[in-house]
Amino acid sequence: MITFVIALNTFREAVRDKILYVLVAFGVLLILGSKAIGYVSFGQDYKIMADLGLTAIWMFSGMVSIFVGTGLIYKEIDKRTIYTILSKPAERWQFLLGKYFGLALTTLVNMVFLSIAFLTYMWLSGAPVTIALFEALFLTFIEMLVVTAVAIFFSSASTPILSAIFTTIIFFFGQLTKWIVDLATVLQGSVNGAAAKERARYIGGLLYKVYLVLPNLHNFNIRQDAVHADPGEWIRMNEMLPVTLYGLSYAAAVLLAAHLIFSRRNF
């Protein structure tokens, strides 16, 4: 119950943040402008619209998670309202979980609004609204749950500016996990010369460790496949459950780490 109250208050606080409306407005403008860009590509206008629409929803939802989420806990500390919250029968894990669910709800509402605008615009333009688009949107939301957890983690341990920087770095390199593991494999097996091979193996091993720590956000990116899918075609039906479970598990692990750090802070 306490977690629910904190989540609801967090959502109310987030929707009053002006940056949320700025990001949503830019997202809608990019979606509406996608058709004009699509006219430049002969015969590819619907695909361009779908690609830009999905990318806009992904990008601006990520920005909401990062720029709103990284300041949530710091604001409570700065305004000293955290003392009131934690002096009541509220555990620190309930506070963190409430903040997470509140931000996740904010991200969901943002995504639903942008998705309705995107799909309605596609339909009114005569473009096919395929099942694959809904698959891509669902996995984008699961990705945002991971990014939100990372934002809460850094917010529990650092200032908003540093939290935003670190979360953005994770968000960026999380998209490159496939490239990182491929590079690590190449470095560990295809370099000639003893000294060079040793250095390559060390760098490759280091990259592989980075790969294991980073969230594999590449798993959630099926936007290109969704754009080129036929109406009625499921493109990742067999992978939806394991990818979803991976995202939820990673988010849970990050929140646990955030709790371990936050529980040791003195207020």
Where are these regions (language model features)?
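Central hydrophobic cores of alpha-helical transmembrane segments
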Residues: 23-28, 162-174
